[in-house]
Amino acid sequence: MERLVIEGGTVLPMTGQADVYENGVVLVEAGRIVYAGPRDGAPHLAGARRIDASGRIVMPGIVNTHCHAAMTLLRGYADDMRLMEWLQTKIWPAEARMTADDVYWGTALGAYEMLSGGITTFLDMYFPADAVARAIQDTGIRGIVARGIIGVGGPSEALSRLDESREAFHRWNGKAGGRITFMVGPHAPYTCPPDALQACAELADELGVGIHIHLSETRDEVEEARRNWGKSPIRHVYDLGLMKGRHVVAAHCVHVDDDDIAILAETGTGVCHCPVSNLKLASGRTPVAKMRRKGVAVGFGTDGASSENMLHILGSEMRIGAIQAKELEGDPAVYTAYDAVAMATIEAARVLGMESEIGSLEPGKKADLILIDAERPHLTPNHDVFALIAYSALPGDVVMTIVDGRIVYEDGRLTTMDGREIMARVREAAARLVRE
């Protein structure tokens, strides 16, 4: 791994709102941050490649807490439908036709898109796990693989998916220099009966990993849960023991009450906030500010490209999420630009249980960082750099993305794979998958 000296930019380590270093320096060695701060006091790093960051913002890589990356294959297909109708009549039938090769190329395209917009880490729930892991390896992104597990077809269906998850974990966990890690991924309480959820919990304990699950995404889901179990999906999962003593990452959590929020806070469950997908599917608005006041860690997620249509947090989830949080509480001061940037970086890392490794530019942490070109019309002038990022910056403003100290995206080009081949393969597969 080469040594890097990134100098002359506005450095945002995300260690506090006051920590903004104009004409700052970031030093990278052996894939980790050595220094991030003012030029004065920066140690000398011999034999390093020097990167001029003048006119650019240097900040931690963005963390996507919830994604279905391979669903790039279905971008723009079956839009403008209600969630369950969309899943049951369009998405699930198309997914049933996908091959492992399709998923590899779809995930590779998702990774390419994310890296181009500054996302360096993502938590993915999809299948098959081997194809997802291989795409993470080849594109250079950092990814957590949670093989989606559905148990409505009976115990044998869930067990086969659990076996696949276990085998993929032993093949891939820690590979690609540690960029590939795993969670267990029960899809949701409405697709996983209690015995399947218990089996997922047991596998998570066996492998020593966390759990990723969709919870309380729609009003219909919550109402059905109350009819079936007499309680909310979150209370149901909690009472089954899934959230006790394990790291759980819960996607959506839109329709929650005070009891649900108390459970999330008590158990340290991280919440993935996907505002654009939730708005587009008319699922509702997550009470983000209220959750955070109660001590719940919340990070932005994109969901899949078939519901959000883009796998970008900058200029999309971050901007819409910040505005929505203000509108929901009727108070523009309840949620700040810094809050939004934190929810895309260090707080998102906490959601994933990775805050000791990523999410901020601190000595010893993984060298996952991005450079944003601030010399753009929509980023001029700069009165508040956090406001620029939260409300004005766009994915195309990212000019360099670094993962593990390696430049994986630079000036519009993926450096690890042929981006044109990825797009061509996805176009070919997508045309076949939606042919009815």
UniProtKB/Swiss-Prot annotation:
Substrate binds at E95, R147, R161, H187, E217, D303. Binds 1 zinc ion per subunit. Belongs to the metallo-dependent hydrolases superfamily. MTA/SAH deaminase family. It holds the Pfam family Amidohydro_1. This is 5-methylthioadenosine/S-adenosylhomocysteine deaminase. It is an enzyme of class 3 (hydrolase). One of its GO terms (molecular function) is metal ion binding. It comes from the Bacteria. Zn(2+) binds at H66, H68, H214, D303. InterPro entries: Amidohydro-rel, Deaminase_MtaD/DadD, Metal-dep_hydrolase_composite, Metal_Hydrolase, MTA/SAH_deaminase. Signal peptide: none annotated. HAMAP family: MTA_SAH_deamin (MF_01281). Keywords: Hydrolase, Metal-binding, Zinc. Catalyzes the deamination of 5-methylthioadenosine and S-adenosyl-L-homocysteine into 5-methylthioinosine and S-inosyl-L-homocysteine, respectively. Is also able to deaminate adenosine. It comes from Symbiobacterium thermophilum (strain DSM 24528 / JCM 14929 / IAM 14863 / T). Its EC number is 3.5.4.28, 3.5.4.31. It catalyses: S-adenosyl-L-homocysteine + H2O + H(+) = S-inosyl-L-homocysteine + NH4(+); S-methyl-5'-thioadenosine + H2O + H(+) = S-methyl-5'-thioinosine + NH4(+). Its cofactor is Zn(2+).
